[in-house]
Amino acid sequence: PLCSTPLYHELGHFVDFSKGISELAILNYRSVNQGTLPIPKGPQGIVEWATLPDFIWLNHCKEFFADLFSAQFVGKSGVEFLYKLAGSHPASDTHPSTENRIKIVNDFLNNVKNPVVDMFNAVISALHKQGKIISPSLTLPLNLLDVKTTFDNVRPFVINNHNEMHAFINSSWQYLCTEWENPTGIWKGLSKESIEKTINDLVEKSIRNVMILEKWSAQ
C-alpha cells in the first residue's frame, strides 16, 4: 500500500485537468514576477522563463500542482517517495527539478510564504467563487498518527475512521523511512527488503481491518 503513494500525485493531475487549474494559472501568472514558477536550471545553466515556450511553463506548473495536491493528504511522503525512487534530477522540459519540487512542498507544509503556493491558492479561490471547486484553498494534511507503538510490536494499527486513512498512509511512510535509515528494536539486523515487506503487510492489514469492520457493520 505504501507504494501507492504516487497515486495521490496522479489524482492531482486529474483534478488539474478536469478543473483547468494550470490553464488558468498560465493566463494570469506566466508573465508575472519573472514567471512566478522557479526559474529552471538545466544542463546549460539557468535560463529565463521569457526565453522558454509556454508548454514548458505549463508542464512545470502541472507537476507543482500535483505535488501540492498530494501533500494535502500525505504530506511530504509524495515528494520523498519521488526522491528515494528517482533521486535528485535537474529541470527538464517536462518536469521541474527535484530540489524545487521538494522546497515548494516543504514551504507549503511549514506555512512558509511561497509564490507558487500563493498562485495556486489564488487560482483555487477564483474557481471556488465560481462554484467549480469545493475548497477555497489548499489545505494542510492531518497531523501524523502514532503508528510506532503498534508497528514496533508488529501489530496492525487501529484506524478510527476514513478521515484518518490518509494520515495513516503518511505516518506509515515516515515510520518506514525511519526504520530503513536507522533500524531499531525488532527491525535491527533485518534487510531493507524485509523491513519494507513487513511494514507494508502491517499497513495492508490495518486497512483491511477497517474494510472488514465496515462490511460487518453494514450487514
Residue ranges, per PLM feature:
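Metalloprotease/metallohydrolase-associated module, dominated by Zn2+-dependent proteases
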Residues: 41-102
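Post-HEXXH active-site segment of zinc metalloproteases
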Residues: 17-55
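Non-catalytic terminal regions of proteins
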Residues: 1-4, 96-219
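Short pre-active-site segment immediately N-terminal to the catalytic Zn-binding motif
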Residues: 1-7, 54-57
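Catalytic Zn2+-binding segment of zinc metalloproteases
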Residues: 10-27, 73-78
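Generic structural signal for hydrophobic core residues of well-folded globular domains
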Residues: 11, 15, 73, 85-86, ...
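Generic helix-packing signal
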Residues: 16, 70-74, 176, 210
